[in-house]
Amino acid sequence: MSAASSPDRPPAWAHPSAEVEPGAVLGAGTRVWRFSHVAAGALIGGDCVIGQNVAIGPGVIIGARCKIQNNVSLYAGVVLEDGVFCGPSCVFTNVTTPRAEIDRKAEFRPTRVGRGATIGANATIVCGNALGAWCLIAAGAVVTHDVPPLALMAGVPARRVGWVSHAGEVLGADLVCPRTGDRYAERPDGLRRVINLSGFGEDISEEQSASVG
């Protein structure tokens, strides 16, 4: 394990029952809890919380300040940007048509989860899709296509049922966040914050919208 450190933050820490393989990189302040496994080649940013019984595969990239709750497996090809929340037992895949007796490692498809996104408990993210920044995937949803930034997704298969603010609040018809007062507007390419009273979170760029379009 390579554990980055800084003068004002504690070094990364792993519970004695966790296994962090040599060649995995953990950022300063990151904590890995009981019975979790971080494979060689995984890169985890600073100040992350990795819950119990989490499996992080080789080549997985996790940004800073992410929270991975219990019983989550992240496979090769998964990238989580900064501030992503993965709820308990949410599921990622990396092959669309797996067979036990056929090697399909060459067919792994990547999954990218954008800045600040939330994935609810027991949700499934089918590989090859991108989740936009600050989106919210409801518990138990099954995501089978790209998700726009700030979208609220629910159901099987998941569909957009509304919008959420950067603070994670469901937006009503007025598109005003009830927690922060931030105001949003629908544009042809998605939702945009037009009044930022809270100062929380980065606004969505045209490039971010296009990347999941």
Language model regions located:
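Flexible, glycine/small-residue-enriched loop-and-beta-strand segment within the central core
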Residues: A3-P16, E21-L26, R31-L131, G162, ...
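Short hydrophobic beta-strand segments in globular cytosolic domains
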Residues: G120, V126, A138, V143-T144
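Conserved catalytic segment of ABC-fold P-loop ATPases
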Residues: G132-C135, P148-L150
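Internal alpha/beta core interface subdomains
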Residues: A133-L136, V142, P178
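Cys/His-rich microdomains that often coordinate metals
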Residues: R160, E169-G172, R183-E186
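Short cysteine-rich clusters marking metal-coordination/redox-active sites
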Residues: S165, C177-T180
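Short microdomains enriched in Cys/His and/or Lys/Arg
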Residues: G181-G213
